[in-house]
Swiss-Prot record:
The keyword Signal does not apply. Keywords: Glycosyltransferase, Magnesium, Pyrimidine biosynthesis, Transferase. This is Orotate phosphoribosyltransferase. It comes from Buchnera aphidicola subsp. Baizongia pistaciae (strain Bp). Pfam families: Pribosyltran. Gene3D superfamilies: 3.40.50.2020.
């Protein structure tokens, strides 16, 4: 695992974003760990978070004209990433995010920010079953003439490498896009194995 990914994992542990116990996920399944990106809740946190997403976008070599945040947690992610791309990589890119509810007055519509055209990258916090990603992609395609070239998430929390390949390959093939994560559950396992004081948490994720 490269240095900046380790820095991100340290950042997650410092902010207690990665928790262990018993948690019910949106899919209805129970998980022994939970990634709560809502705990990145200060200006300093968002500056750091934006850098890690921006770095992942740069490393991905994806072709894009705008970045899109999936409401609600994707909203601060996409804004901080747009700022980080400009600050750290001198890339001035427009952003957009969706509303959960259709607005019928003022600017109206389903989206806020740049009008969705051309190739975009989707930003979200986690991926488990892929159901949320499927819903978001279908929603965007039903409301905008655009092409999603890739998806960037903070954590791929798929339980094992076989599942990861299946879920990602299915989505990538279905929508002709690429999925990248800042870290995966396998990165966390390998990192914890190297840190004695973190061995206690391995029982939750292996």
């Amino acid at each position: 695992m490269c240095k900046w990914k380790i820095q991100f994992l340290d950042f997650c542990l410092e902010k207690k974003v990665l928790k262990f116990g018993k948690f019910q996920l949106k899919s209805g399944k129970c998980s022994p760990y939970y990634f709560n990106s809502g705990l990145f809740n200060t200006g300093n946190d968002l500056q750091k978070l934006g850098y890690f997403y921006a770095k992942t976008i740069i490393e991905s070599n994806l072709d894009y004209k705008a970045i899109f945040g999936v409401a609600y947690k994707g909203i601060p992610i996409v804004i901080s990433t747009a700022i980080a791309l400009r600050k750290y990589f001198n890339i001035n890119i427009p952003y957009c995010f969706n509303r959960k509810e259709l607005k019928k007055h003022g600017e109206k519509g389903n989206f806020i920010g740049q009008k969705l055209t051309g190739k975009i990258i989707l930003l979200d916090d986690v991926m488990t079953s892929g159901f949320s990603i499927n819903d978001t992609i279908n929603f965007i395609h039903s409301h905008a003439n655009t092409k999603i070239s890739g998806i960037i998430i903070a954590l791929d929390r798929t339980r094992n490498i076989n599942n990861k390949k299946n879920i990602q390959k299915n989505i990538e093939k279905k929508y002709n896009l690429k999925i990248f994560s800042i870290i995966s559950i396998l990165d966390i396992i390998n990192y914890f194995k190297k840190k004695k004081h973190l061995h206690i948490y391995l029982k939750y994720i292996i």
